[in-house]
Amino acid sequence: YLGTMWGIYTLSEKFLDVDPCYLFNDLAIVKKNAVELSEVDIADKPDGFGFRGVFINDEDLLQGWKDGGGARLVGGGYYYVTVAKTVIEKVVETVLRLKLNLVIPATFIDLDNPPEKDLADAVAERGIYLSQHHCEPLGVSSFTFENYCKKYGKTGRFSYSECPEIMENVWSFYVDKWAKYDNVVWQIGLRGLGDDRPIWQDDVPTEE
């Protein structure tokens, strides 16, 4: 599926002169009324890296100017609204035109919130691998943990040493949601609160 799509996009780039990043570089596409090809011989080879992707980090420049994204469950700063699905679909198109195959669709994403789930859906619908932000082990950031506790009436700290049962419950809840997608590269590293410090600054250190 991806190979066929990349083949079509390669023809678009090489013979229709459509730049893979045309949506972002302000280069107008010149319409061609006809294209004559006497012979086409394009060969490609496997890339050295199996996963080639982009991480949409602090997606403030992709939202706010386009309605339809919906509210986010992470408050503060520019995290108050999600990127509209029509916008993320164009980002995914660019990713495919660049022959990439993996996307982290947002800085923080809570699949229990439909507007945020739409971002993951837009990626998965095009057959691309999904992955998670480096402070979202198994799809759960400290913010997602807080959302879960608030919504489902749970209490506890984002700390496996202090609250292992609730942490395992939250992880299981979100693993079930992420596992519904065919292609996921799982993040299993454990970070502290947010993105600015390691876990041992928030949790009790162990011998490990």
Describe each region flagged by the PLM:
Residues 1-163:
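Feature activates predominantly on carbohydrate-active enzymes
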Residues 91, 119, 170-174, 208:
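A general structural detector for well-ordered alpha-helical segments in enzyme core domains, enriched
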Residues 180, 185-208:
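Active-site neighborhood of glycoside hydrolase catalytic domains
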